[in-house]
Amino acid sequence: VYEVDAFMVNNLDPFELDQCSNSNFDLTKQTYDTFTKWTNKNETFFCAHNGYGFDYMLTSQHLFSNLHSWPWIFSTGNARQLDSLPIVQNFDFYSPNKIKFEINEKNNKIYRLGSLCKANGFEIKNLHSSRGDTEGLAKLMALLREKDPSLFRQSLSFTNKQNVLENIKAIDYFCHPETFYGRTRQFTSSYLCEHPQFKNYHLVFDLKHDPELIFQEKSNKVLEKTLNGAPKKYRTIKVGKNPFIQDKSFATKFDDEYAKLGHEVLQERANFIMKNRKEIAERICLIINDKFEEQTIDQTELIPEQMIFNLNPSSNDKTLMNKFVMTNDKDEQKRIHKNFDGPLKHLSEMILLDKYDKDGFDSKEEYRKVRKNISRRLLSTNKEVFPTIPEGMARIDTLREEKKDDKIGLEKVERINSHLEKLASEHESYL
């Protein structure tokens, strides 16, 4: 089943989508094959607006759910991932007034793709469609390149995480911007270590704080309160997400705490970090690990589709997954399905149902068992981690009230409602 708002925002008709010939699995495979064909030839830059917050993870999640054994295609080999949202935010900070913005009711700049394109003279006619958003994004990136070629090139130079890591580890201190609630500010930091819990996340010490004063504290319990008390004394750089690293000369270019300290003090603090990096990193990692152990562990059982970070298929399972994806033979996929167990069996079951319906199973009993399990989940009145039909119908009621004076919008709502009612009737027949 689907999110009602996704159909509203993207102006989609669920009845029309029912007529599409491609299964979810087939479309995912075609997308994967196209992307890997590009990256096998040359270095390929993928770009999405708010991609780090949505598109890249969603695509990887989709690949995982369709049994691709390596779903991280945007950060592998020749693939490079970019996100135009932080690039625009950094442009506005380091090269202000080069691009135009719409302003919201709180007098804040709007960074949504459609708004940016409209403000800069190339409004997306078919907003939220694949073609419309792609063309709008291409024009936005071309505008940034035109307005400040040097800054644009610099924005593309941090896509190789190994190069980023080598760079920030080798220099004494550097600058890096972060954006919170629409406001960008620059930090000046010195490298510490990799985060002990999250791969490719690296900790840096914020040099507006005096590390020598802070780390003279012998008690880790007291130190933990100091480090994590506002403002936090260390920050995180995600080296795999194109972080913008600025030369340390920028530390004093703005009227802020770093400018008041001056390069002499910043250099002294960076030297202290570099000289004592191993000991400092060990203490911080110990504090972070202890904190993670203290936190209440969420005992909620993950459904198979959520296990992209938790499921570690064996080499044999990965071989079977690859064979399942590569073959176009229904009987071969059914045979492989029987060799899976646990979450992988569930995922392959969903693919067989989506792709072949009844023909994906050896008996009517097996087919009805699968359908009954799905129907039970989708008709659940509990709060689930996936969209349910009752949840969709409740959203329809809300949208009816919101769209009561919008004839076209209300027609869309009723069209989706008719489709939901049809789905509900179909699923009820399997209970």
Region roles according to the model:
Residues 7-95, 251-318:
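Conserved DEDDh/DEDDy metal-dependent 3′-5′ exonuclease domain
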Residues 125-166, 216-264:
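Amphipathic, soluble alpha/beta structural segments
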Residues 21, 25, 53, 131-134, ...:
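Generic detection of long, well-ordered alpha-helical segments
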Residues 41, 174-175, 430-431:
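Conserved, well-structured beta-alpha core segment at the onset of a catalytic domain
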Residues 157-237:
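Acidic catalytic cores of enzymes that act on phosphate-bearing nucleotides/polynucleotides
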Residues 213-215, 224-431:
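Non-catalytic terminal regions of proteins
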